[in-house]
Amino acid sequence: MGFEELLEQVGGFGPFQLRNVALLALPRVLLPLHFLLPIFLAAVPAHRCALPGAPANFSHQDVWLEAHLPREPDGTLSSCLRFAYPQALPNTTLGEERQSRGELEDEPATVPCSQGWEYDHSEFSSTIATESQWDLVCEQKGLNRAASTFFFAGVLVGAVAFGYLSDRFGRRRLLLVAYVSTLVLGLASAASVSYVMFAITRTLTGSALAGFTIIVMPLELEWLDVEHRTVAGVLSSTFWTGGVMLLALVGYLIRDWRWLLLAVTLPCAPGILSLWWVPESARWLLTQGHVKEAHRYLLHCARLNGRPVCEDSFSQEAVSKVAAGERVVRRPSYLDLFRTPRLRHISLCCVVVWFGVNFSYYGLSLDVSGLGLNVYQTQLLFGAVELPSKLLVYLSVRYAGRRLTQAGTLLGTALAFGTRLLVSSDMKSWSTVLAVMGKAFSEAAFTTAYLFTSELYPTVLRQTGMGLTALVGRLGGSLAPLAALLDGVWLSLPKLTYGGIALLAAGTALLLPETRQAQLPETIQDVERKSAPTSLQEEEMPMKQVQN
């Protein structure tokens, strides 16, 4: 008897599992609150050089600014430069100082803002960009973008650490570590007195939050039977969408970055308390030889699900026999993903797809400027559009297949980026429509990637394969904010980069085998039974056909 038979006896889907899904919903909601927080936390409002000495009774403010600030090529006043000396104005003497110093050339000299900046606080009372003594604008705007990169780099490192530690010490114990670490580091970030302190604490917060991404899914699915895992996975993914929309509301109500950071961090406190009711994975306990504790959790599951169990077939001795079969002989490594030709082909393609999915998703999600809506409306709309995109994925993977859905959603993302390049900056409505379409396609690509990748890898390497692709995906997420800095080279270059990477990932997805209506591979031999695809015709994995 294996673990699946044990789970069938105690109930693979019932009140016990539903309670578990509900208790693990909080981490899924917290993830987008932190991952997409830079939209509000690092927002850069309209700003200009601080210009002390403006006449208190000066009635023509715009004219006075014209004398002190140069204009950009698009006609707007510069945010980062001022004239070295005020320019002459009609009926004023503001230009006399300039003329007396011999500044008679056609192009007046300009200098950087030496006395700080003045910010428009109509939308944000404060962000890390406007923080006193930080001023992460103009020459320092790279540090503003780098804060997001540091955060996602922390997520990448944390994923590796939590993946190993949760296998070594258990899911529930490491989930507690993730909760406590996120709470402490989040509070420290909100109290940062310097940019360096903020960057360090946010990086460590990202590492702590990685525990949620690595632990919650296995802890939830390992208590579910095979039949209900897909339903539970789709249900759980809606919690992320709920967090995306909740962020818009929280950001609207709290305009100060320190209080906003506190608001998205403090829910970790009730999360810590909720762990009292979250069970450890019985499957993991059996692999570690903790038979007594696993037996206790299984009996509790049976009681909550109203399942009577036979004492003879469900004794601690019977569970011990199952444990002997569940013990891990050798832990797989990342190298196992590249040892055989077919598996190597799948791994290389999945790496490119996951990098493209994350790079384009976060590139689009973190860029809410230049649209016809304010940042709060845009974020709410971006969250709301994720719900129909999940329905699109559900229908498409059933009838068109996983491979075409993955390629099609990435192609749609690339086309949305490319079309936005053709729309002029004054066509706000069209820019908004294209951005929303791109967000829907990128979310659909993300959802498909999780399903498709898990079906490509054999059971013995599935967790390892998902770990590798998630690792590379987080690398793409960490580079996405930095790609936005390419606008200093050419204004359209960031969108061209995001779209180009998405297009490359779409083409790569077509090189993967189709898994629709195919049984999940169990061993490496199952995967290697057929050579890598050489055409774009639909292929079926060489296993028995099952109901989708």
From Swiss-Prot:
State the tissue distribution: Mainly expressed in liver and kidney. In kidney, expressed in proximal tubular cells. Also expressed in pancreas, small intestine, spinal cord, lung, brain and heart. Expressed in fetal liver.
Q: Which gene encodes it?
A: SLC22A7
In which domain of life is the source organism classified? Eukaryota
Kindly list every residue the record annotates as glycosylated. Answer: 91
Question: PANTHER family from the xrefs?
Answer: SOLUTE CARRIER FAMILY 22 MEMBER (PTHR24064)
Bilayer-spanning residue ranges: 21-41, 146-166, 180-200, 204-224, 234-254, 259-279, 346-366, 376-397, 404-423, 432-452, 466-486, 493-513
What is one term from the GO cellular component aspect held by the record? basal plasma membrane
Which keywords has UniProt assigned to this entry?
A: Cell membrane, Cytoplasm, Glycoprotein, Ion transport, Membrane, Transmembrane, Transmembrane helix, Transport
**Which residue ranges are recorded for the region named Disordered?**
522-548
Annotated family: Belongs to the major facilitator (TC 2.A.1) superfamily. Organic cation transporter (TC 2.A.1.19) family.
Recorded coiled-coil stretches: none
The protein, known as: Solute carrier family 22 member 7
The catalytic activity, as recorded, is: glutarate(in) = glutarate(out)
Q: What is the protein's species of origin?
A: Homo sapiens (Human)
- GO annotation terms (biological process): alpha-ketoglutarate transport; monoatomic ion transport; organic anion transport; prostaglandin transport; xenobiotic metabolic process
